[in-house]
């Protein structure tokens, strides 16, 4: 089996070839734009992706850290999800997205079998999208990272949109071989 390849497309969007699977994280393909977040808040995207969303197809799955902010899932990224057989995301994200979305809680596993028959385990990992604190998730929303494992392959940790070193330490204590 060839070594995994990781290609940064832009921002949080990364194309991954792993154990015979073609994966994509947090699809963002909109051109430069400003998103209205409501309440007078906005988010300005200063640069579009260097490739069109369709150029990454076909995909086996999208690993979506969270769906509720356009800097991790923009309009063209949302359109792309309908062309992908599986989107792994948060439990709340599954409810909002529907369709091919499958929600995971931290430490929950999902197995995908590649066309070559390799079983890849995707483990949802805890992540914190903002400052440490008991009410952060309630205010900012759920976010997860991912761990990719397969026999004979290196382990890959995808932090998602995690901003907490404490969470990384917790993951490192539980999974020593990253």
Predicted region positions:
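Metallo-beta-lactamase
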Residues: 3, 86-154
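Metal-dependent catalytic neighborhoods of phosphoester/phosphodiester hydrolases
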Residues: 73-83, 93-94
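Conserved beta-strand hairpin/beta-sheet module of binuclear metal-dependent hydrolase folds
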Residues: 2-52, 138-160
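A short helix->loop->beta-strand "cap" motif at the edges of active sites that frequently abuts
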Residues: 21, 83-86
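Active-site beta-loop-alpha substructure in enzyme catalytic cores
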Residues: 155, 175-178
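Pre-active-site segment of Zn-dependent metallo-hydrolases
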Residues: 21-64, 75-79, 130-133, 162-176
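Short beta->alpha connector loops
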Residues: 10-12, 68-70, 93, 128-129, ...
């Amino acid at each position: 089996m060839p070594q995994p390849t990781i290609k940064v497309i832009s921002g949080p969007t990364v194309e991954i070839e792993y154990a015979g699977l073609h994966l994509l994280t947090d699809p963002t393909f909109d051109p430069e734009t400003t998103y209205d977040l409501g309440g007078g808040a906005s988010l300005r995207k200063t640069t579009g992706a260097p490739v069109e969303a369709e150029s990454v197809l076909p995909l086996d799955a999208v690993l979506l850290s969270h769906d509720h902010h356009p800097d991790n899932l923009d309009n063209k990224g949302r359109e792309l999800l309908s062309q992908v057989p599986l989107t792994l995301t948060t439990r709340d994200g599954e409810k909002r997205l529907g369709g091919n979305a499958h929600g995971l809680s931290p430490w929950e596993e999902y197995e995908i079998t590649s066309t070559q028959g390799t079983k890849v385990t995707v483990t949802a990992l805890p992540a914190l999208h903002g400052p440490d604190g008991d009410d952060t998730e309630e205010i900012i929303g759920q976010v997860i990272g991912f761990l990719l494992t397969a026999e004979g392959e290196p382990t890959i940790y995808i932090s998602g949109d995690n901003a907490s070193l404490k969470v990384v330490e917790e993951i490192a204590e539980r999974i020593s071989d990253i």
